Amino acid sequence: MTNDNTGQIEFWNSDHGLAWARYADAVDTMFSDITDAVLDAAEVGVGDRVLDLGCGNGGTTLAAAARVTAIGTVTAIDVSGPMIDRARERADAADLVNVTFILDDAADYPFAGGSFDKLISRLGVMFFDDPADAFARLGPALDTGGRVALGVWRGPRENPWAMEPVAAARPFLDMPPRPGPEDPGPFSFADPDRVRRVLADSGWRNIDLAPLDFHIPLGHTMEDALAFVMEMGPLSAPLGKVTGGNRTRAIDAITKVLEENTGDDGIVRLSGACWIVTARAG
């Protein structure tokens, strides 16, 4: 099997990709625990040559660039034009000269052999059509023994930040079918046995998964959190198609979930759960 990521490329270059680009700073705040855990697990340090897969708006890219300093390099790749544009803007604003962005599909991009010491990804590798093929192609891009660290979601039930608003609104919306557990999507790497199998079959070794549990700030105000949930993720399209009473009821149900998870400081937080996956190139 080979990768046909056409659907994902279309999706991330649609209005959805534009929305993620608009929320770049908020997303980095939400997922900062994952960023730190991935960079620590990869042991990114001064002088490293880093490849950032599915870099999105460049949050992990910029964080890695700070660690490698000017004598290291970070190459970042993503299929989303809107997010790559946003990432470049952010890198330019930070006067970074050791960062390169590539608008392309990492699954079959012709990286030169031995170009990198470290491979990192924050939530960017769960969308490959054929992940074993993708990781088999990526392996030679690292020096032998090069280290990979990936942040990937655990199961839906362990991620209330994503699922509780959906469950509350579902009775009032026409939701699309749930993807299968191994179909491309946010939870396709939730099964640790599958992750180990994919990486082992594609030539990686010393594979390990460590759990990361944390709280995700969906917004610093109730209004911000509600706007984020309505514009991003699985509820954005169904909410855009419904009108009248069902739309009102769906928004009321989402609001109730967010209110129940608002702290005394006004910040809306729900729990999230990831695997931090590490391995070495064969």
Q: What feature does the model see in each segment?
A:
Residues A132, G139, D143, R147-H220, ...:
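Conserved catalytic/acceptor-binding region of the Class I
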Residues T29-D48, A63:
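Conserved alpha-helix/loop element of class I SAM-dependent methyltransferases that forms part
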Residues R49-Y109, D133:
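Class I SAM-dependent methyltransferase SAM/SAH-binding core
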Residues V68, A91, A169, L199, ...:
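Conserved hydrophobic residues forming the short capping helix/wall of the S-adenosyl-L-methionine
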Residues A107-K118:
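A short acidic, Gly/Pro-enriched loop at the edge of an enzyme's catalytic core
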Residues N3-F11, H16-A19, Y23, D28-F31, ...:
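Conserved Class I S-adenosyl-L-methionine
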